[in-house]
């Protein structure tokens, strides 16, 4: 693991709180090397997502991970707001 722990994006607490308010189960995994930020369970589905602020770019590791899963037909979302996250899990339209 890197000498420097990965920090959570500043909007992460707000997004996680909104997800939990609609009944989602959220686990933080952003401190694990080469992982995305959260795993979210909601209404029988599991989402593995990266949380980013505004136009903050993905890191090289994040981009590589998302592309690797895309090659096998799995889309890993990048959520930049509470609305994106709630829409992403199907809690709102």
Regions found by a protein language model. Give the residues of each.
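Catalytic phosphate/metal-binding cores of nucleic-acid and nucleotide-processing enzymes, i.e., regions
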Residues: 1-93
């Amino acid at each position: 693991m890197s000498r420097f722990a990965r920090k959570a994006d500043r909007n992460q607490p707000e997004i996680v709180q909104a997800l939990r308010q609609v009944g989602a189960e959220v686990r933080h995994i952003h401190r694990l090397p080469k992982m995305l930020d959260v795993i979210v369970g909601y209404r029988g589905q599991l989402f593995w997502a990266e949380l980013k602020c505004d136009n903050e770019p993905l890191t090289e590791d994040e981009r590589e991970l998302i592309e690797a899963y895309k090659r096998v037909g799995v889309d890993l979302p990048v959520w930049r707001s509470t609305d994106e996250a709630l829409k992403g899990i199907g809690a709102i339209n």
